[in-house]
Amino acid sequence: MSSHDDARWMRLAVKLAWLCQPSATAYSVGAVIVAADGTELSRGFSRDSDRVVHAEESALGKLAPGAPGAPGAPDAPGDPRLPGATIYSTLEPCSKRKSRPRSCTELIIASGIRRVVIAWREPDLFVADCQGYELLEQAGLEVIELPAFSEQAAAPNRHLKFLSSERARGVCRHARIIRPSYRNATVCNFSHFLVIVALFRATGR
């Protein structure tokens, strides 16, 4: 996939995120799975089929119910197109899960998908220190972050207003330090800074 293709599919994922029913306890996320030849295989968004389903989980489950990347049947054969596919998600895939036995990171790895494109890293709001990015890389997947889409991806989550009580503690409260083995170490991830600016504007604070 080219950078132009990545931008095109991420724009679609952002549109899907806006379809989510807002929740005070979960993010609004959109996801699209695209084959190696550039055709769309599946799409999903948070809470599109039940109140706790995640976007990546939904997209995988629609494409191949019972496949390794789908809940409930980790040993079933997967869709043969998945190893060459890319999954686009507006948020870093979860690495810890309370509502399901397997995280979206685990589902993606099990599905055979080898390329993941995200718009922004998960803030430490519901689960501390999400490691989706790192775990995917450790499993050998190519993981790409598109900071240019961070504000757009955060916008459907403006109802959370998760910065309101943290404002006095500084803008880096929810920006995690990225480990040097994966990226250049930094105290305040620039994409998170853009997200924070967007959410302050959206909430009028």
Language-model-derived ranges and their functions:
Residues 154-191, 205:
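N-terminal nucleotide/polyanion-binding subdomain common to many enzyme families
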Residues 25-29, 53, 168-170:
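Short, basic and Ser/Thr-rich N-terminal targeting/leader segments
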Residues 41-152:
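Zn2+-dependent cytidine deaminase-like catalytic core
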Residues 1-6, 139-147, 170, 184, ...:
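Catalytic cores of nucleic-acid editing and processing enzymes
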Residues 39-40, 182:
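Hydrophobic "anchor" residues
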Residues 5-24:
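Short, basic/aromatic recognition patches
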Residues 29-35:
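Short beta-strand scaffold segments in enzyme catalytic cores
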Residues 201-203:
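Short, intrinsically disordered C-terminal tails of secreted or membrane-associated proteins
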